[in-house]
Amino acid sequence: MAAYLFTCSILQTLSEAGKIEIAEDKLLHYLGELPGTPNGPVQLLENICTILEGQGRATHGNVIRHVLNIVVTEQELGGLGISGKSWEEVDEHTLHEIKFLTDAWLTAAESRAAARHLPQPLKQQDTRRLPMNLAEKILAHHAFSVPRRERVVAGDLLRVSIDWVIASELSWVGMKHSVTSLDMKPSAWRNDRFWLSGDHTVDPRTYHDKRVQALIKGLESAKRDLKMTENQGSNYTIMHTEFVRERAEPGMLVLGSDSHTCSAGAVSALAIGLGAGDVMAGLATGETWFKVPECIRINFTGQPAWYIGGKDVILSVLKQLKRNTYAAERIVEFGGAGAKLLSCDARFAISNMCTVRDPNDRPELKPTADDRSTSRNLVLLQAFLFPTVSLNRLSIAAGARYEGASYASTFEIDLGEVEPFIAIYPSPDQVCPVAERTGMRFDGCFIGACTTTEEDLVLAALVLEAGLKRGLTLEKGKRIVVPGSLPIVKNLRALGLLDIYKACGYEQPAPGCSLCLGIGADVAEAGSQWLSSQNRNFQNRMGRGAVGHICSAATVAASSFNMTLTDPCDLLNDVSETTFKEYLARCKVARGGSESKLAGGKQANNVQYIEPCLLGENARSAEGEVPALEAAAVSLDDARLGSINSRIYKLDDYVDTDAIIPAPACVGSPTDEMLGSHCFELTNPDFRDYVRSGHRVIVGGRAFGCGSSREEAPRALKGLGVQCVIARSFAFIFGRNMPNIGMLAIVLTDEAFYKAAQQGENIEVDVEGRVVHVAGQTFPFSLDDMELQLIRNRGLAASYQKLGSKVFAALCQKPAPLPISALADATLAQGGSIGRQMDW
C-alpha cells in the first residue's frame, strides 16, 4: 500500500510541478516487469528516469536522476542514505522527503528558466576595453548595464544580478521579519539558490529549548514555503563551510546575511555580507546594487613552512597592515606567486578572517589571481543539474592576471616569514609571535568555528597525537573541538582522528558556531581565559566577561596539554609532513576529489581565459518603463523634514555590533523596541536611560558598527529612540543597514566637530540645510541620493512593498535633482535623511 500511494503522489507531483504525464498503470506495470531488482523507492525513481529519457524528456530525466543521487547519498554527506532499501525499510518521513525533493527540483528548473541569464562572456578581450581587477570584472559581468563600454571604475553605481543568497537560522529571523512586519510573505527569485543552515544557536543539546525549537521550525517553514533545494537543516554544517566546499564557484556574486560570507573569496567569488533586510530584498528579486569599490592588492611571495595554514597567514597580514588603514572602504585582492602554494582550506581561513581585518567591515574579495593549478573542492552533491555556462566560463577567468588593472595600493607579504602567531584579546590586530608570549595560562582551549578548516583539524589532531606519544599529561581545563560540518566529521572519524581528540579530553559537540558566538549550548564563563582558533576575539564574544585570544588550531592543540601558551613548532617536529599530506589526500578522495587537485598539484584541464561582457546603458530599454522611486514615496501631507534637536551621547572608535546589541538578545527580541531594551547593556548600561532622557544623537568615532553584519544593531538603536548617528566613518554593512531600515547616519571628518561635540552637549541637525549646529559652530554634510530615497520611503523593505521586483531598477536610475520640497514626505521620527557618502 505504501508503494502504491507513494507512486501516485510522485505521479501527481510530476504532473503539477513538471507538467509531465505518465500513466499510472504504465509505471506500475513497468515496475513489475523488472525481475530481480530491489523493490523500493530508489528503483521507482530509476524507472521514472528511464521512462522520461525514453520520451525524449532528457531535462526532466536529469532532474529525477539528481533527486535519486541525493536519495542514495549518505546522510553525513547531505543525502537520505536509503540506497538498496525496500519499501518496508523506508519510513513515511523519508518518503515525504523524496516527494518534496522531486517537487523542489522540478520547480527549480522552472525558476531558473524564468530568472535573468548573464550575457555570454567574450572569448577575447575587446581591444577598446581597459584593464579591470577581478572585483570590477565580476560586478561588470553581473551588471544590467554599465555607464561606459571600456570598463567600470570605482564609484560607478551598478544594479547587478546575484548568484546565491546564504543565511543562518538566526539571520533568517531578521530576514523574514523585514517582510512580515509589512504583511508580506518571504519569496525567492530562485528556489535552488538559497543556502540556509542552522548553525548559530541550534544544537542537539538544546533542541528541547522553546527558542531553539522556534528557530528549527523557522528553518523547516522556509524549506517548505520556498520549496528550497539547499536547506541544510540543523547542525549539518556551519553555513560557510560546506557552501564554499560544495556550491561557491569562481566569478560568482554571493550575498549573505553574515559578515563571514566573504569566506567564498577562497574560490575567487565576490561574496558579500549584508544586513538581513538587504539580503531579503536580494533573495526576493535576484538583484541588488553596489557602488564599485576601490581595491588593494596583496601579493604573496616566498614559500610557507608545510605546517603554516591560513590562520597564521592572515594573522601575519593583520600584524603588518593593521585595521582601518589601507583596506578601509576597499576590497582586498590576494595573488602573487605564493598564492599557488596555498590550499583551498588556507585560502578559506584567510578570506574568512578578512571580515575582521578591517573594522569598516568591507566585503572582502579573495581571488587567487595568479593560480592556474588549484581547482576547488567538489563533492558528490555539487549541483551538476543546471550549470550556468557563462558563469562556468567566467570562473576560469578568475585565475587570470590583471596587468594594468587599477589598485589603490599594492603590498607584498613573504609567506616564508610567517610563523605561529596569536592575536591578543580584545583586538584581532594586536598580533605577536607565539614564541614571545609562551606561558600564558588558560582555563579552556577551543578548536572550531568556520575559520578552522578540515586541514587545520587534521594537523591539530596530529599535534595532539605527537604529544600523547611523548607522554604529555593533561592538566585541568575545558577542551572543545567543533568541526565545521558532518562531512568533515566523517573524514576525521575515518582517519581515526576523532579518537585522538577524545583521548586528549576534547568534548565534541555537533557542527555549529559554538563558543565563537557564545549564545548556544557553549558559553564561556565570566572571567575565564580561553585560547581559541575562532575568528573573532572581541569583548564578550565567547560569553559575557570571558577573555579569548585567537591563534591557529595547531597552536591551540599544543597548548591544551598544560593549558599554557605553547609554541607548536616543537611538537610539529614529531609530525610527519608526508602523513599530513596523505591524510588530506584521503579527505579529498572521500569528497569525490583527487590528489592532483591539492595545492601544488597539476591541473589536467586546459584553461581558457575569457572576459566579461559589458552591457551598455541602452540595455535598460528592454525592461520597459521603470517607476521612479520618488513617485512611489508615501505622502505625508505638507509636513516638511524638520530638524533634530537633541543632546549628544559620545562614544569612541570601533564600536562593534556585539556591543550595540549582544548576540543573546537577538534570539529573543523580535521587535525593534525589544531589541532597544538590550542596547549596549553589557558595555554601556547607562546608555538606554540617557537616550530616554533626550540624548538621541550618537557621536561616534571610526568604523562605527564594525563586527557582525547583524541588522539588529541599527534596529536596536531605532527601537530605543535614537534619531541619528554621526561618526568619522561607518562599517560598510552597518552604514548600509542604517538607510535600509530608515535611519539617519552622517559622516563628519572635521576634527573641530569632535572637539565641540562633547557628552551632553546640545546639537541640532538641519537636514534640509545639510548642516549640523553644535557649541555655536556649524558643520556641513552631504546626502547620498540613493540613501535619501530609501529613507524617504521608510527603508528598503517598504520600498520593495511599493515597487516589488522593480525596486532596484528604480533605486539605480539616475535621479533628477531633488528640490528641497521633495523632502516634505519624510520625517525625522521615521528615519530622517542620510549624511554620508556610500563608497560601496
Swiss-Prot record:
Positions contributing to substrate binding: D258, S259, H260, R536, R541, S709, R710
Chain sites annotated for binding [4Fe-4S] cluster: C450, C513, C516
Keyword Iron among UniProt keywords: yes
Pfam families documented for this protein: Aconitase, Aconitase_C
GO biological process, one term: L-amino acid biosynthetic process
Annotated InterPro entries: Acnase/IPM_dHydase_lsu_aba_1/3, Acoase/IPM_deHydtase_lsu_aba, Aconitase/3IPM_dehydase_swvl, Aconitase_4Fe-4S_BS, Aconitase_4Fe-4S_dom, AconitaseA/IPMdHydase_ssu_swvl, IPM_dehydratase_rel_enz, IPMI_Swivel
Entries under CDD domains matching the protein: IPMI_Swivel
Disulfide bond residue pairs: none
Gene3D superfamilies: Aconitase, domain 3 (3.30.499.10), Aconitase, domain 4 (3.20.19.10)
Enzyme Commission number, as recorded: 4.2.1.-
Entry annotated with the keyword Iron-sulfur: yes
Top enzyme category: lyase
Superkingdom field: Eukaryota
Keywords, in A-Z order: Iron, Iron-sulfur, Lyase, Metal-binding, Virulence
Pathway noted in the entry: Mycotoxin biosynthesis
Induction profile: Expression is up-regulated more than 10 fold in toxin producing cultures.
Other remarks on this protein: Gene clusters encoding host-selective toxins (HSTs) are localized on conditionally dispensable chromosomes (CDCs), also called supernumerary chromosomes, where they are present in multiple copies. The CDCs are not essential for saprophytic growth but controls host-selective pathogenicity.
Function per UniProt: Aconitase; part of the gene clusters that mediate the biosynthesis of AM-toxins, host-selective toxins (HSTs) causing Alternaria blotch on apple, a worldwide distributed disease. AM-toxins are cyclic depsipeptides containing the 3 residues 2-hydroxy-isovaleric acid (2-HIV), dehydroalanine, L-alanine which are common for all 3 AM-toxins I to III. The fourth precursor is L-alpha-amino-methoxyphenyl-valeric acid (L-Amv) for AM-toxin I, L-alpha-amino-phenyl-valeric acid (L-Apv) for AM-toxin II, and L-alpha-amino-hydroxyphenyl-valeric acid (L-Ahv) for AM-toxin III.
Protein name per the record: Aconitase AMT8
Gene encoding the protein: AMT8
